[in-house]
Amino acid sequence: MSSDLWNKAQAVFAGGVNSPVRAAVKPFPFYTRSAKGAYLVTEDSRRLIDFVLGYGPLILGHAHPKVIEAVKDQLERGWLYGTPSRAEVELASMITKHVPSAQKVRFVNSGTEATMTALRLSRGFTGRSKILKFDGNYHGAHDYVLIDAGSAASEFGVPFSQGIPTEVSSTVLVCPYNDLTCVETVLKREEIAGVIVEPVMGNMGVIPPEKDFLPGLRKLTREYGSVLIFDEVITGFRLGLGGAQSYFGVTPDLTTLGKIIGGGFPIGAVCGRKEIMDQLTPSGRVFNAGTFNANPISMTAGIATIQELEKKEVYTVSERAARVLAEEIDRAIKMDHVVNRVYNFFQFFLGVKDVRNANDARKAKRDLYVKVHESLLKEGVFIPPSQFEALFTSGAHDDDVVNESARVFKKVLEDLT
């Protein structure tokens, strides 16, 4: 039972969990026994419709048969070589085919490693030391980005983590999202190595870029000689095969990827312009290495996933599911609210009229959102326990799943709002 496991977990894990957002489910997290398609099955034998999907990677749904088949085959042939493999070349070739900025690729093991490497690359390439990021953008759990961070950092009240030296934090400057005036002021005043941004904010709920924001970043970074980094760990291969940069028509210098490109297995990647990527060791002097970089299991799962995405049906199904549910939620909420959706992921904010940056998102009625989450969970629908995460849909969220979910959302939201 989940309650028994929670009691044991608190004795062996800090805070009882291995990633803080998992502790946001109250009174204690449920524990998952298995998952298939759009559903989770808990240790308490409850079947839940899942709109978390591992926080984004599972765009095909849980336990997709093509991914299972590919990974089983790879397991029979070994799962770690310490040498290059055919699979890593194939997956990188898929990425360079579809992602506009990706002339070369370096695989790592997480989104955190990807952004850490991208920032190091921007510093090595430009010879500058300072970074510009945006309030509420989350780029992983390393020192240079845990400053005004979103996601669980904001949920648990620590957007500035303890343990980061001032010598590090002093090299990171922050602007509000969607604020080009601030960006230009900083770029004029400081020697900025890299500007890192979530092209769609996915870690303060969902907040889309305003029309001129991404093109403006592209123009300003070129003008002032800074490296533009799109953190597409969430949006990469979610908003289409080319990610946010294709969706919005703006090509950065570097892109970080993760989540979907590993098919639900641990992965990260940095890709971008040849002259920047070639600064990485062994061709350059910006160091990166890893025992599990490009491990065959993640490579194989990623290939199988992208092969399914290339058929386009997954995008059609997942976009329709998100659109229908976002519209149903919008109709059902009676109080002031915002529903922000970009293609196949979305979030709703209660008690506010406009959400265009992190400060706006923080004004939403988070306590009421938690009550909605708890009521939905009782009715068999699992959404993120944090206001500052996103709801994701997949190719497994078919009409039957959408119709049942819409019924539950309508019932809960009309009752609570």
Curated annotation (Swiss-Prot):
Highest taxon of source: Archaea
GO cellular component, one term: cytoplasm
BP-aspect Gene Ontology terms: protoporphyrinogen IX biosynthetic process
Catalytic activity, EC: 5.4.3.8
Chief location of this protein within or outside the cell: cytoplasm
Catalyses which reaction(s): (S)-4-amino-5-oxopentanoate = 5-aminolevulinate
PTM-bearing positions, type N6-(pyridoxal phosphate)lysine: 259
Subcellular location: Cytoplasm
Record InterPro entries: 4pyrrol_synth_GluAld_NH2Trfase (IPR004639), Aminotrans_3 (IPR005814), Aminotrans_3_PPA_site (IPR049704), PyrdxlP-dep_Trfase (IPR015424), PyrdxlP-dep_Trfase_major (IPR015421), PyrdxlP-dep_Trfase_small (IPR015422)
Classification via CDD domains: OAT_like
Co-factor requirement: pyridoxal 5'-phosphate
Pathway(s) of this molecule: Porphyrin-containing compound metabolism; protoporphyrin-IX biosynthesis; 5-aminolevulinate from L-glutamyl-tRNA(Glu): step 2/2
PROSITE patterns in UniProt: AA_TRANSFER_CLASS_3
GO molecular function: glutamate-1-semialdehyde 2,1-aminomutase activity; pyridoxal phosphate binding; transaminase activity
Membrane-spanning segments: none
Leading EC class: isomerase
Keywords from the UniProt entry: Cytoplasm, Isomerase, Porphyrin biosynthesis, Pyridoxal phosphate
Family: Belongs to the class-III pyridoxal-phosphate-dependent aminotransferase family. HemL subfamily.
Full protein name: Glutamate-1-semialdehyde 2,1-aminomutase
UniProt gene name: hemL
